[in-house]
Swiss-Prot record:
Pathway: Protein modification; lipoprotein biosynthesis (diacylglyceryl transfer). InterPro entries: Lgt. GO terms for cellular component: plasma membrane. It is a multi-pass membrane protein. Keywords: Cell membrane, Membrane, Transferase, Transmembrane, Transmembrane helix. This is Phosphatidylglycerol--prolipoprotein diacylglyceryl transferase. A 1,2-diacyl-sn-glycero-3-phospho-(1'-sn-glycerol) binds at R138. Belongs to the Lgt family.
Length: 270
C-alpha cells in the first residue's frame, strides 16, 4: 500500500471473500503458539503433563483477551460510551497488556488450584513464554501503526539504522514517529534470554515469574514515557503507574515469601 510517496505494509494479510484477516491477529496468534511450545517443552522436562499448558492456554487466552479489552475500554470510556458498538471491535487493536496479564494470572491461579499443581511452578515455567508472546505481539502494533511515540524526522530513524520497511511504516498522516513498539519488543526479547538463563540458576519457586514482572515493568515504564497514545487517569499514565506498582509488589513478595518460609522449594523441584 502507498501513502503519498511512502510505501507501507497493508494491515490486512489476506481477504477471504468479505472477511479480512488482519496481521494483528496472525501475529498475536503466532506469539501464543510459540509461547505454548516453549512452555510445554519446559513443562515436560519438569514433570508437567504436556496437555496441562495446552488446556491452560485454551482457557487463559480468551479470558486474557477479554480482560485486556475491558481494561482498555474502561480507561477510554468517554469514547466508548458514545460508540458502544466499537467495544467488541478489536480488529484494529485496543488490547491493554496489563489487563491481559491480570486476566491470565487470575485464570492461572484458579486453574492450578483445580488441577492440584503449584501456581508458582506453572507461573515460573510460563514466564519466558509470556514475555516472548509480548515481544512478538508488539509487531501487531507495528502493522496497525499504533503504540508509537512522538514525532521524529526520517533522518532520526535512519540514524537508528532501521530497515526501510520499519521507517516507512512509522510514517503516519504525513509525520514520522518513534518506533516505540520496536524498543519494547527488543527489551522483551532480551528479557526472554535473561529468563531462560536464570532457569539454570534454579531460583526459588515463584521468583522467575517475579523477575519477569520486574524486567517487563522497567522496560514498559521508560517506553511508555515516549508514547503518545497512553491510557491516562488524570495526569498519570496508567501503564507507568502499573509498572511501578508491579516492581514494588514483586520485590515485596520475594522478600516476604522468603522470610515466611513460603519459597523453600527451588524452580526445578517437584
Amino acid at each position: 500500500m502507498l501513502l503519498g510517496s511512502v510505501p507501507q505494509l497493508d494491515r490486512v494479510a489476506v481477504q477471504l471473500g468479505p472477511f479480512p484477516v488482519y496481521w494483528y491477529g496472525i501475529i498475536i496468534g503466532t506469539g501464543v503458539l510459540l509461547g505454548l511450545w516453549l512452555a510445554t517443552r519446559e513443562g515436560e522436562r519438569l514433570g508437567i503433563p504436556k496437555d496441562t499448558f495446552v488446556d491452560l492456554v485454551l482457557i487463559a487466552v480468551p479470558i486474557a483477551i477479554l480482560f485486556a479489552r475491558m481494561y482498555y475500554v474502561i480507561f477510554e470510556w468517554e469514547y466508548y460510551a458514545q460508540n458502544p458498538s466499537q467495544i467488541i471491535n478489536i480488529r484494529q487493536g485496543g488490547l491493554a497488556i496489563h489487563g491481559g496479564l491480570i486476566g491470565a494470572v487470575v485464570t492461572g491461579i484458579l486453574f492450578a488450584k483445580r488441577r492440584g499443581v503449584s501456581f508458582w511452578k506453572l507461573a515460573d515455567i510460563a514466564a519466558p513464554s509470556i514475555l516472548l508472546g509480548q515481544a512478538i505481539g508488539r509487531w501487531g502494533n507495528f502493522m496497525n501503526q499504533e503504540a508509537h511515540g512522538d514525532e521524529v524526522t526520517r533522518q532520526f530513524l535512519e540514524g537508528l539504522h532501521l530497515p526501510d520497511f520499519i521507517i516507512n511504516q512509522m510514517y503516519i498522516d504525513g509525520v514520522y514517529y518513534h518506533p516505540t513498539f520496536l524498543y519494547e519488543s527488543l527489551w522483551n526479547f532480551a528479557g526472554v534470554i535473561l529468563l531462560l538463563a536464570l532457569r539454570k540458576v534454579n531460583l526459588r519457586r515463584g521468583e522467575l515469574f517475579f523477575t519477569y514482572l520486574i524486567w517487563y515493568s522497567i522496560g514498559r515504564f521508560f517506553v511508555e514515557g515516549l508514547r503518545t497514545d497512553s491510557l491516562m487517569l488524570g495526569p498519570l499514565r496508567i501503564a507507568q503507574v502499573m509498572s511501578i506498582g508491579l516492581v514494588v509488589i514483586s520485590i515485596i513478595f520475594i522478600i516476604v515469601r522468603r522470610k515466611m518460609g513460603q519459597a523453600d522449594k527451588r524452580y526445578s523441584e517437584n
